[in-house]
């Protein structure tokens, strides 16, 4: 894989085709503190891109009423056939808004068929194909084309999309793995009368998945986490969005790193099997002893 800059867009390519395109390099979601109509999406271009020994370094220096003064630094590296994207957000001066979230969107196979129905997905145990047993093109549990889950709902934080047309699989994973979590303070909302579904939280848990709600499919990652139009966590009660925001305060900063990989497979089942096999070979998972006896 290699990285190309196309009119302020970042394109990920293999020798045969473009496998992904980042059309909006910096997407920040601002929380206004409410539970309804509460997320303000802001998109920014890079203000500076420089070549590095094995990739690119891109910066966005932003100052406005939404994010205060914030700096986003992205480092793209080609490493062992993958593209590693490390993202850092630094709050230099706060705004009047309490929370912020970083969003990463990669349009898949931008020069080929890439609507939600054309691709197949794998992220055990949450997603196998589309969980679409009735074959209507929608995920069956939530009837949605937006399947985004917290990193820790997966056996391993990796999400794979496979194209039957090109026989190409594209995967995104957290590398290194999430290192910490915390218990958020979820107050009873005066708007809903229930515990907050949006809240401030310093956590290293993000979310990832696919969003095909607008006709083309994007690999989508959020940091801190956000879970689509519905969430497994709250599904028993009702279908509501669920997500955290990092405190938008002077001096705060956070970093997240993704590895984007691309391989060609004869079929979807090979993409699933060999993807998991490669993760096992790379991570060498070991059984952890129980902290207390099972009885």
Description of each model-found segment:
Residues 1-250:
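Beta-strand/loop-rich accessory regions of lumenal/periplasmic or secreted enzymes
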């Amino acid at each position: 894989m290699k990285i190309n800059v196309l009119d302020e867009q970042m394109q990920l390519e293999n020798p045969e085709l473009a496998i992904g395109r980042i059309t909006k390099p910096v997407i920040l979601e601002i929380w206004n503190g409410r539970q309804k109509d509460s997320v303000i999406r802001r998109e920014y271009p890079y203000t500076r891109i420089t070549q590095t020994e094995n990739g690119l370094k891109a910066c966005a220096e932003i100052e406005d009423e939404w994010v205060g003064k914030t700096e986003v630094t992205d480092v793209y590296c080609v490493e062992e056939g993958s593209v590693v994207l490390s993202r850092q957000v630094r709050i230099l001066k706060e705004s009047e808004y309490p929370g912020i979230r970083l969003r990463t969107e990669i349009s898949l196979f931008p020069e080929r068929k890439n609507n939600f129905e054309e691709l197949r997905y794998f992220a055990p145990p949450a997603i196998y194909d589309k969980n679409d047993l009735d074959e209507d093109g929608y995920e069956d549990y939530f009837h949605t084309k937006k399947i985004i889950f917290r990193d820790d709902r997966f056996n391993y934080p990796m999400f794979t999309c496979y194209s039957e047309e090109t026989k190409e699989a594209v995967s995104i994973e957290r590398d290194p793995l999430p290192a910490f979590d915390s218990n958020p303070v979820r107050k009873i909302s005066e708007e809903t009368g229930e515990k907050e579904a949006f809240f401030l939280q310093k956590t290293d848990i993000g979310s990832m998945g696919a969003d095909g709600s607008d006709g083309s499919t994007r690999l989508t990652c959020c940091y801190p986490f956000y879970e689509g139009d519905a969430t497994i966590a709250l599904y028993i009660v009702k279908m509501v969005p669920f997500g955290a925001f990092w405190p938008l305060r002077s001096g705060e900063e956070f970093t997240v790193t993704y590895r984007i990989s691309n391989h060609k497979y004869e079929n979807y089942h090979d993409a699933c099997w060999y993807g998991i096999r490669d993760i096992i070979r790379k991570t060498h998972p070991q059984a952890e002893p129980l902290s207390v006896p099972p009885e």
